[in-house]
Every structure is written in C-alpha cells, then in structure tokens.
C-alpha cells in the first residue's frame, strides 16, 4: 500500500538499484543478502503499518458519523422549536431564522473531515416584552390588548406563563356548568328514578332571630334537587315581615296562619309548635297534597343528604338527629374529665338490630342537665328537646288521607288524634304499631340534621325584618366625617363622659385608700 502511494520515478530508481546489486560479486552477494534481509524486514513491517492506518481511518469515520448525528439533531431542534419558543403571535414580531448552512470538507492523505458551520441571524423584535420593573402594568396591558405571552425555556421545553394568575371567569363558569351537568346525569342514572314531591313543614313566629333562622333555612331548601313546597305555619297570624322573607326564596310557599300566639315559656312553646305541625298536616290532607313530609324547624341545620334519604321512605321513616344543647356561655361551669366521659351521646334516632330492622330508640339523656335548663325564651341556659323530636320523622302524605291506595291498617285516622285534648309529643301518635317505622340514613348511623335552639330575649329590640329605614345614629365619630359640627359636639360629649368616668374611678380609689389607712390605724 505504501508502494502505491510513491511516485513512478522513485519506483524506477529502486528497480535499477536492485538489478545493479544482483550483478555484483561475492562482496556484493553478501551485500545483496543484507539488502534482501532489509527488504524482507520492510515487507514485514508494511502490513502492520497499513493495518494501523486502516483502524485510524475507521475511527475517524466513526467520530465524524457521531458528530454529524449530533449536529443533525441540533439542526432539527433549531429549525422546528425556535419558532415555538421565541416567536410571538403578533404579525409584526419575528423570530430567529436559520440563514445559512456552510459545509466545509477537508480531505487529507489519511482521512476526510467534514465540518458543519451554522450561521444564525436574529432580527430585533419591534415590540419588545415589558421590563421586569413594571411587570403587573405590562401584563395587564398585554392581556387587554391580546398581545403575546412570555415564555421561559427550561432545557429544551418551554413553559407558558399566563399574563395574569387569576383564571378566566368565563372558563370558570363553563367548568361549573359542566360539573352541574355531570351531577345531573349521575343523579339521573344512579339516583332516584322517579323523585317524589317534598313537603316541608315549618312552624315560626315573628321575633328577633326569625330573619336569621328563616334565611338560613330557605337557602338550604333552594339547593334541594327535588320539587318542593314549603308550608310555613305562623303563630299569631301571618305578618308582612314573614311574607317578605318567604318571597325571597323563589319556592312554592303555602303561608298558613295559626290563631294562638307563641308563648315565652319553653314548655308551652314546645306544645304550641306541636299543635302548629298538626294543623299543617290537616291542611295537607284537605288539599290532598302528595309527597314526602319533612318537619324542618327554622332554627335547625339540615344536610342535603337528608332530602335524598327521604325519597326512600314508604310510609313513615326516622332519621338520627344531633342535639346541640350546650350554650357555651362564659358563666357555664367547666366539666371535669369524668363528667366528659360520662356525658351521654347527644343523638336522637332509631336503633336497629343485626338484620337492619327497628329495635328501639336512642333518646337524649337529660338527667345531667337537671335543674340547669332554660325555662324562658332567651335565658342563658341549655335548651333541651322534650322526648322524640318531630324533626327526626318523615311521613308519606298519603298516610293522612282518608282513602289512599295501599294505606296500612296500623295507621290512625288524623281526626282521632288529639280530639280529647291530649298533648301530641311526636308523630308516633299517628301509628297503632310504632315498630313499623322505617330507619333511614344507614339504619340511623348517619346524622342528617342538627337540632338547635338559639333565641334572643323576648323583649329585645330589633328593626322589623332587619330593614333599617331611618339613617343610623352616630355613636362613635369617624376621623374624617362629613358632619364637622356634629363631630365637634360628639367629641365634646365623649371628652366629658371620659372625664366623668375618670373622676369616678379616682374617687373610688381615694375611698379605698382611706379605708385601708383607717383599718391599719385601728389595728395599731
């Protein structure tokens, strides 16, 4: 291989020298032998040298192939990802453009090396991005004008940055509508196939906390996903304040007057509320209102799952009720650890056997509160339920009808209930066999509503319907008030009152110090 690389003239000179050496004598023969030995050594070294150069050539080819693959990946990345990372949606902006690719090939006697040179040309953006000094202003302006959003490159991937971190309200409302639609489809496929009408019975009367309680209840009822009629029985006759509150609900309202006024004694109030509920049941029977009857007091708290459970009742059902009896006032004595452990579970509801049928009732134990309960409305003491509360029962309205298809024999006639003037404590008085009650809420294991009685004093002053007609009187002046003359008068009055209070405090301090000194003198 080395010979093939030598020029032809050198080959001729070598051949002539070899022929001259052969024609020489004995000394020349020995020299020829030496020359032949040297030629043989050169011939032995020639294959090793050619192998070395062949391997070196192959190694250089592999290196060039690897580098060419790497450069091709870089070229592919620059061509197809530069626009996505650095370009903007504005037509006036421009991105990095690959202008030219120069390939230089250098050939030597041993190998061929290819060098790829990439030339990138960038054009200035006529609309540069906003500086970091005014990020919020620039982002707001960009969002309002519909300009491009900035990008941050991490490695080979771009991270999109919103012009403002808050979500788009249109997208939020669209997501809410999608979720609402999904929930409707889930209820349609997996919920109640044929939902029944819900009849909610609420006794109420005009008082300080009526607006508070009715507002909370009406918002709960508005979220019920079933057809609903709200039957409100008002003690002392219907009032405009109650009617205006009920009109805000956008529900089907039946506002019924009750002739008796609500008493201020808790025991009498419980009895009056029971008669009001019984009056509502008679109205339901007279109008033949079909549905499921739920007794929802205005001060109770209801779970929406309750209205799903009542759809399962056949004639009369019962749910567990949480009793919130503690007032939490500052003067209430703290309970010891032993009393806390012995405190009864504040739950009223059905108790089931192993087969899931009604076996009895779990009632609220009021013995630990003996002598500590409130007797008058507004008194700062615990208010306890009397026996089983109506709120824990659910009725099928057809149980009240005189003639109903499939009405069981263990149901009493509504006209026979309370005809002798006996007190009606709970709906079980409507049944001849109370064991036929159906336990709901996973056999009473789920608490679906909470019984609570929170009331203001009977003589408390409050605006009618909590609507303030005249402007409020200024009690404490503001630092910057639009009535400077009133502020001056009030400031003077406040200063005088503070001086009077300070004088009284000093006089009490003087009297106490004098009494201490007199006592010390007597002891001495």
Swiss-Prot record:
Membrane topology: Single-pass type II membrane protein
Region (Disordered): 21-41, 492-524
Keywords, comma-separated and alphabetical: Cell wall biogenesis/degradation, Glycoprotein, Glycosyltransferase, Golgi apparatus, Membrane, Signal-anchor, Transferase, Transmembrane, Transmembrane helix
Disulfide bonds: none
Gene3D superfamilies found in the cross-reference section: Spore Coat Polysaccharide Biosynthesis Protein SpsA, Chain A
This protein's record includes keyword Nucleus: no
Role noted for this protein: Probable beta-1,4-xylosyltransferase involved in xylan biosynthesis in cell walls.
Protein name: Probable beta-1,4-xylosyltransferase IRX14
Source organism of this protein record: Oryza sativa subsp. japonica (Rice)
High-level lineage: Eukaryota, Viridiplantae, Streptophyta, Embryophyta, Tracheophyta
């Amino acid at each position: 291989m080395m010979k093939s690389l030598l020029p032809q003239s050198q080959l001729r000179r070598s051949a002539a020298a070899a022929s001259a050496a052969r024609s020489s004598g004995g000394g020349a023969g020995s020299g020829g032998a030496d020359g032949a030995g040297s030629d043989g050594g050169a011939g032995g070294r020639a294959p090793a040298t050619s192998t070395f150069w062949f391997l070196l050539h192959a190694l250089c080819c592999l290196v060039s192939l690897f580098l060419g693959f790497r450069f091709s990946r870089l070229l592919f990345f620059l061509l197809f990802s530069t626009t996505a990372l650095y370009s903007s949606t504005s037509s006036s902006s421009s991105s990095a453009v690959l202008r030219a690719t120069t390939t230089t090939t250098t050939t030597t006697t041993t190998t061929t090396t290819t060098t790829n040179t990439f030339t990138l040309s960038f054009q200035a953006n006529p609309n540069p991005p906003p500086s970091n000094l005014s990020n919020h202003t620039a982002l707001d302006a960009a969002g309002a004008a519909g300009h491009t959003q900035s990008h941050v490159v991490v490695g080979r991937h771009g991270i999109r940055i919103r012009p403002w971190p808050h979500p788009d309200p249109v997208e939020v409302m669209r997501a809410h509508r999608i979720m609402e639609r999904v929930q409707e489809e889930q209820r349609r496929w997996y919920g109640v196939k044929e939902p029944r009408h819900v009849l909610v019975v609420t006794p109420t009367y005009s008082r300080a906390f009526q607006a508070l309680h009715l507002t909370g209840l009406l918002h709960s009822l508005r979220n019920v996903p079933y057809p609903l009629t709200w039957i409100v029985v008002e003690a002392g006759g219907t009032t405009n304040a109650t009617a205006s509150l009920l009109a805000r609900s956008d529900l089907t309202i039946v506002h019924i007057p009750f002739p008796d006024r609500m008493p201020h004694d808790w025991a009498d109030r419980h009895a009056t509320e029971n008669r009001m509920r019984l009056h509502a049941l008679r109205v339901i029977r007279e109008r033949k209102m079909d549905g499921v009857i739920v007794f929802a007091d205005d001060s109770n708290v209801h779970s929406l799952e309750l209205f799903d459970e009542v759809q399962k009742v056949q004639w009369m059902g019962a749910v567990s009720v949480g009793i919130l009896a503690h007032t939490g006032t500052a003067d209430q004595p703290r309970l010891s650890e032993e009393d806390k452990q012995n405190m009864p579970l504040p739950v009223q509801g059905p108790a089931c056997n192993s087969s899931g049928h009604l076996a009895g009732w779990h009632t609220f134990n009021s013995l630990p509160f003996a002598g500590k309960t409130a007797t008058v409305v507004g008194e700062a003491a615990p208010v306890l339920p009397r026996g089983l509360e109506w709120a824990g029962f659910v009725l099928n309205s057809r149980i009240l009808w005189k003639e109903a298809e499939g009405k069981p024999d263990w149901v009493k006639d509504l006209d026979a209930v309370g005809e002798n003037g006996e007190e009606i404590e709970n709906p079980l008085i409507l049944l001849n066999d109370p064991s036929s009650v159906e336990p709901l809420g996973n056999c009473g294991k789920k608490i679906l509503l909470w019984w609570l009685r929170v009331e203001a004093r009977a003589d408390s002053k409050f605006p009618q319907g909590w609507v303030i007609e005249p402007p409020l009187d200024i009690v404490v002046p503001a630092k910057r008030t639009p009535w400077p003359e009133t502020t001056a008068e009030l400031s003077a009055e406040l200063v005088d009152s503070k001086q009077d209070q300070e004088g009284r405090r000093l006089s009490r301090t003087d009297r106490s110090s004098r009494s201490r000194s007199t006592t010390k003198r007597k002891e001495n």
